[in-house]
Amino acid sequence: MEVYLDATECYLKNSLCFYPSLNIFVSWSVLVGAHVGYIVLVIILRKWMQRRAALNMNKIMMIYNVTQIYISAIMAISLAPHLKKGLFNLNGRFSANIEFWIFVHYCSKFLDMFDTVLMIFRKKNEQLSFLHIYHHATIGFIWGLLLRNGIGNGTAFFGAWVNSAVHFLMYSHYLWTSLGFRNPLKSILTKIQMFQFFLCIVQASLAPFFDNQFALQWSFLQLTYHITLFILFLDFHRKSGKKKGLRNLKQTE
């Protein structure tokens, strides 16, 4: 049976509301240490790989992609029932189920950092964009902030759900192409990623007016963060399109 609490009860706890025993995982030492450590690791690994040949990571990538597909599917399916509770679950009640799966989603952001490690070992330096590093160095920190302040709940479920659903599609694509197959829907996947950011911007814009459980600063944080992601992703997509066009032009000369 689902367990619910009023949002005000969770605010007063100033910690995970239903699972306080997990607070250690969203402590400042973990939040700051893990994300600063990520940036330091990127710098060290890139320097270490400078004079080394690219490594064959095919088997590891296959295991990694399958793991990501499985975890993303479980999170998306587990959070999906809350989609029926109104638009973005605005003013939705705080539940143990949402908090648990948002915590799992938060933990998955640390697994996502392995994307960067794989890119560096494979010497895919063109993929190590500012957008990529910025996203991985910040998204887990933001989810951790929500959880440690007792508001990783309610309408916040939507961000975790839509991101899990998109990640399921993304890692399915990566697995498919790693097996040597071509995905004709790759361009659609890019549009889906951008639509995800757009939906989160809409949610953050509506929350101050239709959700009285979230303080304005949290909606503002989500709004500004997803606007930066949308702009950076749009710029990266535009530049990638230009580079692809130049490569195609050279091949026809």
From Swiss-Prot:
Record pathway: Lipid metabolism; polyunsaturated fatty acid biosynthesis
Catalytic activity annotation: an acyl-CoA + malonyl-CoA + H(+) = a 3-oxoacyl-CoA + CO2 + CoA
Membrane topology according to the record: Multi-pass membrane protein
UniProt-annotated location(s): Membrane
Gene Ontology BP, a term: unsaturated fatty acid biosynthetic process
Keywords carried by this UniProt record: Fatty acid biosynthesis, Fatty acid metabolism, Lipid biosynthesis, Lipid metabolism, Membrane, Transferase, Transmembrane, Transmembrane helix
Molecular function GO terms recorded: fatty acid elongase activity
GO cellular component: endoplasmic reticulum membrane
InterPro entries in the record: ELO_fam (IPR002076)
Catalytic residues (positions): H135
Function recorded in the entry: Involved in the synthesis of fatty acids. Elongates C20 polyunsaturated fatty acids (PUFAs) with a preference for n-6 PUFAs.
Protein name, as recorded: Fatty acid elongase 5
